[in-house]
């Protein structure tokens, strides 16, 4: 609960400092329509985020949403990267340089919904490294990184102190282990 409160505090701080206005939130009905069209269900932690922040200029680039502006729409990204839809990966944000942050919905790396980074210039359909153990912690750490220039996610000690569940995910690279 404390991380959740810190997340919304930093979202509002980001919006104030960067003069960002949040777009309208998504809805439960939109999640159901999305799942019917794509066969990819929207997990509860992402629903919680999208009911507040749905396709906004938050972070280093943009966050993605459901039934929002086309360029920030998850379904539009699926038209560009159909492999992601086939794997039931949900893109949740980009880095402003053409790379993306996604969540696996089939629990292939462990329980829950961790967030991983895809470097489209290296391997557009494979995770490059794990970023966070949960969606809300990802957005919290991302915004702290943008606003406060933290050492996330590449500093192992810093990342594990902030995200103690990080190492429970397997079969995916950690950012400090990159070549």
Regions found by a protein language model. Give the residues of each.
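Secreted/luminal cysteine- and crosslink-motif detector
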Residues: 16, 132, 155-156
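Short, charged low-complexity linear motifs
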Residues: 31-35, 124, 161
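Acidic, proline/glycine-rich low-complexity IDRs
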Residues: 147-179
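Compact, glycine/acidic-enriched structural inserts
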Residues: 114-146
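A generic secondary-structure signal for well-formed alpha-helical elements
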Residues: 42, 53, 57, 139-150
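Short helix/loop capping segments that flank catalytic or ligand/cofactor-binding pockets
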Residues: 100-103, 111-113, 125-126
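A surface-exposed partner-binding patch
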Residues: 1-102, 107-108, 167-179
């Amino acid at each position: 609960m404390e991380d959740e409160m810190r997340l919304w505090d930093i979202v509002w701080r980001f919006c104030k400092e960067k003069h960002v206005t949040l777009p309208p939130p998504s809805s439960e009905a939109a999640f159901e329509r999305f799942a019917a069209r794509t066969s990819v269900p929207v997990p509860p932690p992402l629903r919680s985020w999208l009911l507040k922040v749905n396709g906004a200029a938050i972070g280093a680039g943009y966050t993605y949403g459901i039934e929002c502006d086309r360029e920030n729409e998850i379904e539009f990204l699926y038209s560009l990267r159909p492999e992601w839809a086939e794997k039931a990966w949900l893109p949740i944000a980009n880095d402003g340089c053409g790379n993306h942050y996604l969540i696996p919905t089939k629990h292939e790396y462990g329980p829950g919904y961790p967030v991983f980074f895809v470097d489209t210039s290296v391997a557009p359909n494979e995770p490059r490294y794990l970023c966070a153990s949960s969606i809300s912690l990802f957005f919290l750490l991302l915004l702290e990184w943008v606003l406060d220039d933290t050492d996330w996610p590449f500093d192992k000690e810093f990342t594990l102190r902030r995200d103690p569940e990080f190492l429970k995910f397997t079969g995916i690279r950690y950012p400090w282990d990159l070549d």
